[in-house]
Amino acid sequence: MKQRMKKPSLGTFILILILIGILAYVLWQFLSPKLGYKSLSDLEQRIITNAKSATDDNFFWAFGFDISDFRIKVVEQVGNRIESYQVVADPTIIRLYQAGTGGVISENILSQLGSSAPKVNSWREIIQLATKASLTSEIIENAINQKINNALSLVGAGQSVSKNTIVNANLPVIFNFDRPRGNFLSSFIVPYIPFLLISLFGFWLFFRLSQNSQAGGGLFNPGKNQAIRIKSNKKFTDVAGNAEVKEEIAEFVDYLKNPKKYAAAGAKIPKGILLGGPPGTGKTLLAKATAGEANVPFFFISASNFVELYVGVGAKRVRELFKEARAESPAIIFIDELDAIGRSRGSGIGGGHDEREQTLNQLLVEMDGMVENSGILLIGATNRTDVLDPALLRPGRFDRSIIVGLPDIKEREEILKLHAKGKRISQNITLANIAKRTPGFSGAQLENVINEATLLSVREKTQVITGKQIDEAIDRVISGPAKKNRVITEDERTMVAYHEAGHAVVGIKLRSGVKVQKITIVPRGNTGGYNLMLPEHEKYNSTKSELLASIAAFMGGRAAEEIIYGKNEISTGAANDIEKATKIARRMVTEFGMSNLGPIQYEQDNSSPFLGRDYFKNASFSSQVGHEIDIEIREIISSSYKLAIATIQEHRLLLELIKDTLLEKETIVFEEIQQLEQTLKPLPKSTEIEEKQKVNTKDILEELMGSDFANNQEKSYENEDQNQNSLEAINYNIDDQDDDKNDSESKIDSSKEQ
């Protein structure tokens, strides 16, 4: 719908007029004619030229003195044009030009006037010759006498003033024009125009800021409500997975739409929902869907918007937010990244009473204080529920705390299906397989996988998104883009291949509940290669044997290097593997109770969110117990490392096969790994199968024409495929018969030769 243009306000018109006035004044000052300057020698030459001129083409219209500014101002006729200029001269020169008699005129000047010129005794007479003929000496004398009379009236009675006294007193003496005097406009109004315009502009600016202040914002009221009222087009159908979370929030939305239904049953709806969980799981998306479903005023604000420069701003913004929400009740308030103001009180820089705590205290009062908040639903979202203040989490404020966790395999498939809409994906790809290969991925990461695969399809100019592009997209999300141009020596490349093959052999043979899905020696990020090991089934608990097998798999790379190159030639490539193995071993001893020390938790999470997570970790046990913990961790790592060495030595042939295949292909996948394990032979050249560049037409037709039409069309495609397969079988049989015939003929020929 076309929006109506907003009518300009009176203040806008005033601002435009002020700006036009300033611009006009600047242009007037810039374009107004100004007197130029000439030197005294040039002026003397012009005086002589005009004095000896026999025509009226060169003469002075005006020749005036301004002793107070030491200026001689001239208006001169030069041919067909009139020039105006001024000359800077000291009082001595000016008095010389003014004097009627006296003064020395050089012979050079007199010779330049010519013999036909009248005899002159002063510069004043020469200037008279150079002026217009009608300006006689009598007119000039009367002008001087008038100046004298004006001076006498100023001095007072009983005083005598002579002509020479007036000249020496630096009073202006004008030959044929008076010194110009400005009128009232130019003398009193024009000089003050810039000041008036700037004053008007300042008044207008102050007026506008005051208006903003009255409206609740601007410079004079920084405590304005920063919340944004949004209208979202998202629905719960746009949120894949998180069925339980959507069910909980849908109950709140239904209450806002039908409060009487719950009031009749005597039910009190919870006042707030806290959405927690890892990043990228859809907390903000759920809030957008809630805004789209509720059809009530929805106020969105980030918690960081409350606390800014001025003291007390945060508390005031909280009051303004709830005041506006109460005025439009029923309403929803969504505060994103709540931990920015909701952290536990009593800690932090500035002691226990800083600006953030004032804001939190005001939020606690507004959520459940003396003023009733009936009809207001508060939704908070954060990734750090562990650092929130306990008073914020109690019933009556956030009654329900919902963890939006990482999606399971079924939810991942739903999320992939949602993001795959409108994308041309190869028919050979199933979203279920992608979901299996992406355990631990959040919804944001799954969306990124589909988007990266689409970008790769556009880059490579393929008709559909292929399985290879999906693989590359998953790798990009996990480790970043491949560094194909990295220069690496053949020896180092071989060592990396042995390292990754060692991981794979241990992971395959120990049966730790994971499958080696992919091995690559293509460098990505800070790694020279990696193994993608995924669990066979979705599990939320791990056994001791599985953890030990995982540690052994991590140590497999270092074990392979030691077996092939010796202890003195092992590389730094196992640094990250050792770090991960050590973390698992430490947790087995200190948290899981899987050691000889018994089922005791030695490391409690007493860490401070302000001083660092590991600051107080080792404060709950003695140094002797710490030494015993280190011994147990060392024992777990050492035994797992020995197990990895024994496994690789037992299956040395598989290690060499995987290494050779990696050097040849750089990347091998699960099916190829399985074939190497089962046959213990190199892969045949024909295992590289090109994927069909075929669009999954059924999904597209189902979206456009309906499921019945899509099913019928698919059946027709299947019949065509069966007919094509029959033709191929007939051709194959004919080819076989031809081959048999050729074989028999060759046998006959060979027998003949014998």
Swiss-Prot record:
Cofactor annotation: Zn(2+)
Biased composition (Basic and acidic residues): 743-754
Gene Ontology BP annotations: protein catabolic process; proteolysis
Keyword annotations of the record: ATP-binding, Cell membrane, Hydrolase, Membrane, Metal-binding, Metalloprotease, Nucleotide-binding, Protease, Transmembrane, Transmembrane helix, Zinc
EC annotation from Swiss-Prot or TrEMBL: 3.4.24.-
Cellular-component GO terms for this entry: plasma membrane
Active site residues of this protein: 500
Pfam families: AAA (PF00004), AAA_lid_3 (PF17862), Peptidase_M41 (PF01434)
Membrane topology, as annotated: Multi-pass membrane protein
Official protein name in the record: ATP-dependent zinc metalloprotease FtsH
Species, as recorded: Mesomycoplasma conjunctivae (strain ATCC 25834 / NCTC 10147 / HRC/581)
